[in-house]
Amino acid sequence: MHDIRLIRSEPENFDKALSRRGFEPVSKTILEMDGERRTLALELQTLQTKRNEVSRQIGQAMKQGEKDKAEEMKAEVSAIKEKMAALEGEEAALGDKLQRFLSTIPNLAAEDVPEGKDEQDNKEVFRWGEPRQFSFKPKEHADFAPALGLDFDTAAAMSGARFALMKGAMARLNRAIGQYMLDCQTEKNGFTEIAPPLLVRDHALFGTGQLPKFEEDLFHTTDDRWLIPTAEVCLTNIVRESILDEKALPLRFTALTPCFRAEAGAAGRDTRGLIRQHQFDKVEMVAITTPEQSTAEQMRMVECAEQILQNLKLPYRRVLLCTGDMGFSATRTYDLEVWLPGQNCYREISSISDCGAFQARRMNTRYRPEEGKGNAAVHTLNGSGLAVGRTLVAILENYQEEDGTVTIPEVLHPYMNGITKLEII
């Protein structure tokens, strides 16, 4: 959500910044609605002052025995109250209309974010690791992993497309990946582990920016709850409607959860394999911090995610997303893209975003600065640390052998109960 005071004071700059994200100017529309609401608020204030004055005069008239005059003024007060009630309803309706409009406008991009339309305009800023040189033509995981226990057909029979069922060592490897990532974030990187609910109310998704704009991408239950598309929703909403002490910041939360996405806009894309599923596991990182520390905190989170890829010896690159490819709530986003030899390309495996004060204003989350007066909006950040399914894909493709087996990375051996290779079953 945007600060209406900023739009009032710098409407041209607001429109200019919004145009970088491919949006038409909206400050005029916003200020017209805001002006109408403020005019009504001023009229209400004037009427309240008049009501109070007439009420005072009624008391004086009663003391002086002027009952008829007092009765006339009582009728005047009743008329004022009726008019105020009508104006209050109009003001509330205008306020709701303004808030609904503001809630559909994306965050503004940071100055260092490259301007562009889509992923073709993203900027690669770092690359790690050299792709493995195979002595055979590497396959896509969807072509050989079913023989190792990755069952798409059985999952489709019970749930439909974009679901997977894992058996035996494959299931254990999937579990090991998530557990290893969670251990890294909690034991090495200082995140507090959270076990959150998987169903949330509207206000939680509004706070992080998924609602109202992206309803079609979510699963909605009949009792008006929503399956979480990411643990970001739960972890960020921990501080909803809170005023935090600056000395308590940063707060860092992490969770390993299933995530659920309708993928309404992904028809025909990534229909094979694990890349795009309705249900998948992910380790999420969330940080709550001050405006002064948010950029440094974002880079720290990037490093937390990259360290896992390096420990798994998976080649990857870091990409700074352009204005047209960023998520709705982000002011700056880095994507980590892992090398998939079967597809002969890099694919996103983590997205780490600084959302500035955008989500904090939607959640009404503030902090008390140690120096100075008043409260200020916190900055929120989120990122994958990492997506479990896509990490499994990366391991399958990068560690595949010519005989169809897959060697398991050494750092996962402690979680595998002696299993060091996925064998054909």
UniProtKB/Swiss-Prot annotation:
Keywords: Aminoacyl-tRNA synthetase, ATP-binding, Cytoplasm, Ligase, Nucleotide-binding, Protein biosynthesis
Keyword Transmembrane helix included in the entry's annotation: no
Enzyme Commission number: 6.1.1.11
Recorded catalytic activity of this chain's protein: tRNA(Ser) + L-serine + ATP = L-seryl-tRNA(Ser) + AMP + diphosphate + H(+); tRNA(Sec) + L-serine + ATP = L-seryl-tRNA(Sec) + AMP + diphosphate + H(+)
Pathway: Aminoacyl-tRNA biosynthesis; selenocysteinyl-tRNA(Sec) biosynthesis; L-seryl-tRNA(Sec) from L-serine and tRNA(Sec): step 1/1
Pfam families per record: Seryl_tRNA_N, tRNA-synt_2b
Single GO MF annotation: ATP binding
Residues binding L-serine, per UniProt: T230, A231, E232, E284, S384
GO biological process: selenocysteine biosynthetic process; seryl-tRNA aminoacylation
Major place of residence: cytoplasm
Matching Gene3D superfamilies: Bira Bifunctional Protein, Domain 2 (3.30.930.10), Serine-tRNA synthetase, tRNA binding domain (1.10.287.40)
Keyword Cytoplasm appears in the UniProt entry: yes
Positions that bind ATP: R261, A262, E263, E348, I349, S350, S351
CC terms in the record's Gene Ontology section: cytoplasm
Subcellular location field: Cytoplasm
Record-linked InterPro entries: aa-tRNA-synt_IIb, aa-tRNA-synth_II, aa-tRNA-synth_II/BPL/LPL, Ser-tRNA-ligase_type_1, Ser-tRNA-synth_1_N, SerRS_1_N_sf, SerRS_core, tRNA-bd_arm
Oligomeric form and interacting partners: Homodimer. The tRNA molecule binds across the dimer.
Record's function text: Catalyzes the attachment of serine to tRNA(Ser). Is also able to aminoacylate tRNA(Sec) with serine, to form the misacylated tRNA L-seryl-tRNA(Sec), which will be further converted into selenocysteinyl-tRNA(Sec).
Domain text: Consists of two distinct domains, a catalytic core and a N-terminal extension that is involved in tRNA binding.
Family: Belongs to the class-II aminoacyl-tRNA synthetase family. Type-1 seryl-tRNA synthetase subfamily.
HAMAP family: Ser_tRNA_synth_type1
Record protein name field: Serine--tRNA ligase
Species assigned in the record: Zymomonas mobilis subsp. mobilis (strain ATCC 31821 / ZM4 / CP4)
Gene: serS
